Amino acid sequence: MAYSKACYKLTTITILLLSFTLPSLAGNAENADVSECKAESGDLSCHNNKEAQKLKIIAIPSILVASMIGVSLPLFSRSIPALGPDREMSVIVKTLASGVILATGFMHVLPDSFDDLTSKCLPEDPWQKFPFATFITMISALLVLMIESFAMCAYARRTSKREGEVVPLENGSNSVDTQNDIQTLENGSSYVEKQEKVNEDKTSELLRNKVIAQILELGIVVHSVVIGLAMGASDNKCTVQSLIAALCFHQLFEGMGLGGSILQAQFKSKTNWTMVFFFSVTTPFGIVLGMAIQKIYDETSPTALIVVGVLNACSAGLLIYMALVNLLAHEFFGPKIQGNIKLHVLGYVATFTGAAGMSLMAKWA
C-alpha cells in the first residue's frame, strides 16, 4: 500500500511540475494576434451570460449524480450474482468500460490538447513547429510505465528479503536437528512452496491493481477539472446546453471504468468511498471554480492555453496507457478470455461498443 501511495504522489507532483514549468515558454506569446484569437469564439448570438449561468446551476447537480451512479455501480456489483468477478458478464462490463476510457484519451482529451497547444493565440515558434501535445502524451505514458515498474520492483525486493529470513522451527531451533524434522519438511515443502507462490502472486496482483486504480483516477480527475473549468468560465449558452447531457453520459461511463478498477484493487471501504467522492465532485468543482473566476479567466490567454493543454496531454497519456496496457491487454491475455472463444468475441464487441459510444460523445463534449 505504501508503494501505491508513493506512486500516486509522484505522478501528481510530476504533472504539477510540468504544468507550472511549461507556461514560462509563453513569454513571447503576448505578441500573438488577440483579435484573431477572439474570432475563434464562435456565434456571438449564443453569448448570454445570464442564461449560461442558469444552465450551469442545472449542470452541477446533474453531473454530480451521474458521476456518483457511474463510479458506484461496480462497487455494488458484489451483491449482484451475475456481475460477480468470476462471471462472464463481469468481463464484458470491464471491457466495455475499458473501451470508454481508451476513447476518452484518444477522442476527447488528446484533441483538446492539440487545440490548446496549436492555437493561433500562441506564437508560431515554437508551438506551431513542434508537436508538443503528442510529445507530452508520450512522456506521460512512459512516466506511468516507469512509476509502475519501480513500484513492482520495490515490492519484489521487499518480498525477496522476507524470503531470505530464517524461520524458526516449532522447537525454537533455526536448524533441522532430527530425522523426524527432515521427514516433516520433505512432506510439506512442496505444498508450502505452492501456497507461498499463490499468495505471492495474489499480493503482487493486488498491488498492481491498487497502482492502476490510483493512477487512473488521477488522469480522470485532471481531465474532469479541466472540462468543468472550461464549462464554468464560458458565457456561451449554446455550448453549456449541449455539454450538460454529453458530460452526464461521459461521467457515467467513465465512472464505470474507474469503479471497476477500484473494485479490483480491493481497497478498504473508507478508501473506496474517498475515491468515489473525489471523482464525483471534480467536474462540478471545476464548474464552480470556472464560474468564480469567469471575469478574470481568459481561455485564449497564452498561459491558460499552455497550462490546460499540458494537463490534457498528461491526462491523455495516463488514460491511453492505462486502457491499453493495464486494462485491455490484462483482460484479453488473461486465462479467462483466452480459454473461451465466445467470451473473447463478446469482449471485443463490448470494447468497440464502449469506444464507439464515447467517440460519438466527442461531437458534443
From Swiss-Prot:
Coiled coil: none annotated. Residues 1-26 form the signal peptide. Keywords: Cell membrane, Ion transport, Membrane, Signal, Transmembrane, Transmembrane helix, Transport, Zinc, Zinc transport. Its main location: membrane. Residues 78-90, 151-210, 264-272, 326-344 are cytoplasmic. InterPro entries: ZIP, Zn/Fe_permease_fun/pln. It is found in: Cell membrane. Residues 27-56, 112-129, 232-242, 294-304 are extracellular. The chain crosses the membrane at residues 57-77, 91-111, 130-150, 211-231, 243-263, 273-293, 305-325, 345-365. It is a multi-pass membrane protein. Pfam families: Zip. One of its GO terms (cellular component) is plasma membrane. GO terms for molecular function: zinc ion transmembrane transporter activity. Belongs to the ZIP transporter (TC 2.A.5) family. Probably mediates zinc uptake from the rhizosphere. NCBIfam families: zip. This is Zinc transporter 7. The lineage of its organism: Eukaryota, Viridiplantae, Streptophyta, Embryophyta, Tracheophyta.
